[in-house]
Amino acid sequence: NLNEKQRYSIINQLASSYRIQKDYQGLILFLTDWVEENPNDMYNSYWLLMTADAYRSTGAEPVAEYYFDRILQQCPDLLVKGTSVHFKCLQNLIQISKTPAHRIKYFNELINRFPQNVNTTELYLRLAIEYQSDNQWDQALKAYSLFLEQPDATTIQIPGEPDAYKNARHLVDFNNSSQDWTFESLPALEEAVKKAIRTYNWRQLDKYKAKVNFFTMSWKQDENDANSQEETPMASWARGKRIRYADTLDEASNPNEAYLRTWGWATYVPIFYFYFRKVDFPLNPDIHGNWEWAGIYLGNKL
């Protein structure tokens, strides 16, 4: 005839003794038997949390994931020492779950149910990346937009995502643009740019610039610097001078990026490296894999 709290105290003491001895199999057997025989115990979510933790401690992460998820689906939430059991489950699940669809569900639950306990700016970004991995591009763009709207989006340091803001900004802006400046191949882009220089057609050269996030900067600058995004017509840098270009692309070029050395510009740095980049935008198959002129690096390569 023990009341709920007395019963909780006894079960918790027994479970703790198993855990202290690192007898995880004994702990799992004891708690799963208890939950099965006492389906109405108000602390079952906590006993199953201990079960999931025990499985995780033994390296059985898929089984741990099953129990963490089962708690979310079947058990009411419970505060233990001031912490929500459901919150602890979600924290574990985003660490061990490998399936994008599941991870999407868990990130959404964390954002919607526990915004005060998490960094929503980081989670919007991680949610967007999961949607992208799952080819849910419309949802990915919505999540990227929410990330960009956060006041600390430009300054937040997110582990494993050093270019978070730049990549999100580029994707969202690219999606909202005309997307009409790309070339089907790198040789086509290279020849068009060279022809415009050769014929002094600076207006045409300006048209080849990417309409989103085109930059002009030194090799040490950051693409996101406000100064690097300022547009300057190519004619104002040419000023009637004879501009020359290398016969071939720079040796640092690779399958996704290319550099064309040009020189003779009427500016304090007469050498410009034109930066060409392969377009990574699966949302529009017509241009995905095309090439764009994405920016200009000033001066010799470092």
Q: Language-model segments: which ranges?
A:
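Short, aromatic-enriched amphipathic alpha-helices that serve as compact interaction elements
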Residues: T182-N201
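Solvent-exposed, charged amphipathic helical/linker segments at domain boundaries
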Residues: H170-P187
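Short solvent-exposed beta->alpha transition segments
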Residues: P162-Y165, P187-A188, D206-Y259, W263
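Exposed beta-sheet edge and beta->alpha loop/turn motif
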Residues: L127, Y131, Q136-W137, R242-L302
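Hydrophobic, Leu/Ile/Phe/Ala-enriched alpha-helical segments that form helix-helix packing faces
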Residues: I71, V193-I197, M234, A238
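Alpha-helical protein-protein interaction scaffolds
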Residues: N1-N175
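Generic structural signal for hydrophobic core residues of well-folded globular domains
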Residues: Y55, A196-I197, K209
